């Protein structure tokens, strides 16, 4: 490890010791941050996998039910049923700070004003069968789970990026900056000891 190109003086020695103290403290803080990010990241990955598996099953089952319900209806009637949507959804995103990582928080709100006027669904109960009503209701209920999945996946991506950045900073301090400072401090201490011994020898020669 190449030492720093500085003059071997007591002032430089003091400055380097302060830098080493700061680097050591920063290294510990960054390691703690990395470890906590990793812990939360693992929890989110587990939630992401479980949520994705659950959603894939529920969406597939719901789509199958919808296809079966649609098969018992006239195709033209089905098109008319969904021709004029009345279910409006407002989506907004807040930002949450997790260990200095800004991650999205999705919120959804249904605008039910028109639904209350025209009924819960975008069609008349009299015009459709109960199976189709159930599948549409389940689809609406799955929306929040889909948003949560998107939120978790984006959070995992952002946290993974920050974990990698933090890991590089920790390694830079641990394997480069701190050893370089320690070696330079050791070098200056040796030089100062040599200078002190040489000065002592000169004094002894003068007094003798």
Curated annotation (Swiss-Prot):
Q: Does the keyword Transport apply?
A: yes
Q: Which family does it belong to?
A: Belongs to the V-ATPase D subunit family.
Instruction: Relate the protein's function as given in its record.
Output: Produces ATP from ADP in the presence of a proton gradient across the membrane.
Q: Does the keyword Transmembrane apply?
A: no
What Pfam families does the database record attribute to this sequence? ATP-synt_D
PANTHER family tied to this protein: V-TYPE ATP SYNTHASE SUBUNIT D (PTHR11671)
Q: What InterPro entries does this protein map onto?
A: V_ATPase_D (IPR002699)
Q: Any idea which UniProt keywords this protein has?
A: ATP synthesis, Hydrogen ion transport, Ion transport, Transport
- Supply the source organism for this entry: Streptococcus pyogenes serotype M6 (strain ATCC BAA-946 / MGAS10394)
Which molecular-function annotation in GO is an example for this chain? proton-transporting ATP synthase activity, rotational mechanism
Please name the GO terms of the biological process aspect recorded for this protein, alphabetically: proton motive force-driven plasma membrane ATP synthesis
Q: What is this protein called?
A: V-type ATP synthase subunit D
HAMAP family membership: ATP_synth_D_arch
Q: Which gene encodes it?
A: atpD
């Amino acid at each position: 490890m190449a030492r720093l190109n500085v003059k071997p003086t007591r002032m430089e020695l003091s400055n380097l010791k302060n830098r080493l103290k700061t680097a050591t403290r920063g290294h510990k803080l960054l390691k703690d941050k990395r470890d906590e990010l990793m812990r939360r990241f693992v929890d989110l990955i587990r939630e992401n996998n479980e949520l994705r598996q659950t959603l894939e099953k529920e969406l597939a089952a719901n789509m199958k039910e919808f296809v079966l319900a649609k098969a018992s209806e006239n195709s033209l009637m089905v098109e008319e049923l969904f021709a004029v949507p009345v279910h409006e959804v407002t989506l907004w995103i807040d930002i949450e700070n997790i260990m200095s990582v800004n991650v999205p928080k999705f919120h959804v709100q249904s605008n039910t004003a028109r639904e209350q006027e025209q009924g819960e669904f975008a069609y008349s109960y009299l015009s459709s069968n109960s199976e189709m009503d159930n599948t549409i209701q389940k689809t609406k209920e799955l929306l929040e789970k889909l948003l949560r999945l998107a939120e978790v996946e984006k959070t995992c991506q952002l946290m993974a990026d920050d974990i990698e950045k933090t890991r590089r900073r920790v390694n830079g301090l641990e394997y480069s900056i701190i050893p370089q400072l320690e070696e330079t401090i050791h070098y200056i201490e040796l030089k100062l000891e040599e200078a002190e011994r040489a000065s002592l020898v000169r004094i002894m020669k003068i007094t003798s």
